[in-house]
Amino acid sequence: MEHLTRNSQSPLLFGPETTFAAYVAQFSGHNARLETLGIFLSAVVRATNDVPFFPTLYKTDEDKFRLRKLATRLSDHALEVCLSLDCLNDLQLAFQYENFIVHTFVDGDQSYSSWRRLGDVIASMLALGYHERVETRSRIPDFLVELRQSAFARIYTDDKEVSIFLGRPPRLSRRFCHFRIPIALDSFEANESASGTEVVGPANEIKIDYRAGCSWAALCALLKEEILELFIEKNREHCVQRASVIWAKAEAQWKQLPTHMRYDVSCLNDYRRSPFERDFLISARLDHIHIRFLLRFILINSLAQPDDEMIQIAHEMLTLVVQAVLARDRLANSGSGLVWKVILYGLPASGIILLAILEQRNPYHFGGLSRAKVLQNLRILVAEIQIGALSHPREPNFALLTRAAQTIENFLDSEERHDHHPNGQINTHHDAAPGQMGPWASNLNLEAWDFDLGFWENLAEHPFLSNLEFPT
């Protein structure tokens, strides 16, 4: 420990000619530091999340969770010592970020510990100057410029996604950042020949890898920050105009994304694509649709009564999430895990769909969609949660997923038990007409991001569901 601490007090040296191997040699082997140990321990925790059975370390869930807790505790101790040394560098920032991710696994995405650690990561990144023009610093080798741009893009994205999920203001504003990403994905426009055939250009040479995933997520996060600002815009007309501009940017951004990076329905069955590439394609499309989903929140009059466009957006988002859940054995994490996709995209989409069905006058067809297809997606999501495919009882997101599944299942059961009015209206309230839910709707207090545990508990109080008991 003393040797590691002493090494951590030494600066990481580099110049314009420094190679990646020479840089890594400063914190590996005999030069290993506390940051090195911490990143290794973080990798152990991540592995316990992806590898259910590893006989030399754990054979049961109890062993696995014990190892996860131990590795997290040791990682925390190593980080505390690193911070006390006051020797901030690139490696420590990477360690801090990995420690934040570890706590989302151990404490949950809603925990204060995870929220605080993300704030610490942002503070360290700003102290290092990653938000400035790192590429103009002449002494920095190219690989380190790319590393710092990737770190900025990843941290900037996480700040926006966590803010949306928790309903809190973002802490890293684009207004004070020189926004650069590792790969300029949106700079390649598709050109067409005289015959109308798309010309294959440099865009097709861009590899689908972590850099590409990080870059696309950051581009989407940039637009999501603009959307977050609209939620405090008091001028309705100005808000609508800005929302239109943001969506035009999002559409142009999607069209400029290289063709081989765009999702299509056949990609999950394309044997030529790797599990990583399949996950990237779904993630990229989800990020794009999420922008439209958030924008629609700005424009509808009541979240308790979603319009047809909101329903269609939610349906596409839920369909993508369900496809990812069903194809999980053919996917590899390209930047965001499956559970995070379900929580950030799947649950909000499900919540909107439930609200829409409860408020619709026509019980068999709504929003231009097949009711049977919509209900099928909900049933699949509930089934996958209930069989434990997404979360274990000892994992922190289990309560949120389970409560959401219980509410959705209760709704699906109610669909079969309740009588319908002769004109096709669902009997959503004994005394109120469809779309007028009285006290329940006024107490819902939906915000664009309020699809956490409280939302599902409130939804359970809907008059259509409240007379049925939840399973325990």
Language-model regions: role of each:
Residues 1-78, 209-266, 472:
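Transcriptional activation interfaces
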Residues 48-52, 100-107, 298-301, 357-358:
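Short coil/turn linking the two alpha-helices of tandem helical-hairpin repeats
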Residues 82-104, 337-346, 391-430:
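Long, charge-rich low-complexity segments
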Residues 51-67, 103-118, 237-238, 304-309:
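Short coil/turn connectors between adjacent alpha-helices in alpha-solenoid helical repeat scaffolds
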Residues 100-191, 212-215, 221-222, 359, ...:
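Acidic/serine-rich, low-complexity amphipathic helices located in mid- to C-terminal regulatory regions
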